[in-house]
Amino acid sequence: MEFEEVRAYQPGDDIRNMDWRVTARTGRPHTKLFQEERERPVLFLVDLGPSMAFGTRVAFKSVVAARAAALLAWAARDNGDRIGGIVFAGKRHRELRPAARERGLLPFLKALVDMQPTGIMPAETGNGHWVDILRRLASAVRPGSLVFLLSDFHGLPHQAEQSFARLAAHNDVVSILIFDPVEAAAPPAGRYPLSDGQRFAVLDTGDPTVADAYRNRFASHRDAVRALCHRHGSHFLTLATSQPVPETLRRGLIVHHRRPGARTTRP
């Protein structure tokens, strides 16, 4: 049984569950309510950092990540699961302890809105925040939880693998790589100005060598993240900003649900 809340005493309540501290403070009898712990916590790690503030189709990656996380959180709420996790944008983060129903859902949705990038976000130097965030999540999560990671996973350092392994060792982890189609394949032949908020460059996709290197760079990144997930038993999905979020998640999570021992939340 898990503690849920305190409310005013009602006839028929078990006197053994009286909250004497609140009763003494308010001068009126109060009792503790408990609920049977049927479902495990569902936690989210949502990346809204500088590299996620990019998009050429439909929406920025950060917006698609928030949409996907919100859909999964609503499904978890409808399933009776507790919702929590970490929403981070570079070195800033908001940590939310798992809570049931609206007490978990609403603060999480608010964090997804509040942490969205505004204006031009300069690229950050260093990637130690990834190590710190994964370490925080691995320390906070209770064994047996369902964990969703939503990010483009750019800047994920090798040092983060230890925390990732710790997280995946005793939890069901689903990693969702968010990307824009222009990241996966170079746009039509031409010269395109690029900027990360600090530096400027021109991409010449008319050069076949450049176009091939561009495509291979994304494929190598995607394959490296997939390999990391597979090494530690984490399910891996990709979600393009041009894809319908509910249908893409549903297809990917149905495959995950069929794996032996896997249980997940489907929107």
Give the role of each language-model region.
Residues M1, I15-N17, A189:
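Sequence-level motif detector for i,i+2 pairs with an aromatic at +2
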